[in-house]
Amino acid sequence: MSDKEPVISVHDLPLTFKVKYLGKQPAKGLWGMKHTRKPVEYMVAAAKNLPPHVILPIVRLTINRDGIQFVNITDKAVKSESIRFSVDAISYGVQDLVYTRVFSMIIVTDDSLDNGVPFECHSFVCESKDQARRITYALAACFQDYGRKVKLDGKERAIKKFAIDLRTPEEQAAASDGETEA
């Protein structure tokens, strides 16, 4: 970790960010940049093709010990429902390597494959690449706290796997040169 990397611990949570909601798309896998790239490309292309008077929804994104929630604050006159994802439903979080202002996460929507693809990629456009990085580190702190609680709990439970990619976009790009979808 470089000197410029944000240091965020569970004691810093909750953290709230004002970002734009890029949207959600099906993801083909549980974790890994290879499962967020195509959904992000699709959502960015769709956003670029929006009519001039249409903007992406502005949301208040909050990361706490229990997970992530966001609520649309674009039109303050309309009360929007908060969308929540518990930490055990989030399998992956990453700052995009191409669009460095984009933070994406993979959500496990269903534990079975009976209903098609059980994973969704949700993406947010941040004010800066540093903000996208802070969101990634905040989610990492949330994951660490969840792991600590599971260990302390000591009960038998189904093991849920999750990952957070803390590499910089440059490090991700260097590592992905040999990565394929096969």
Q: Predicted regions span which residues?
A:
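Non-catalytic membrane-recruitment/adaptor modules and adjacent regulatory linkers
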Residues: 1-182
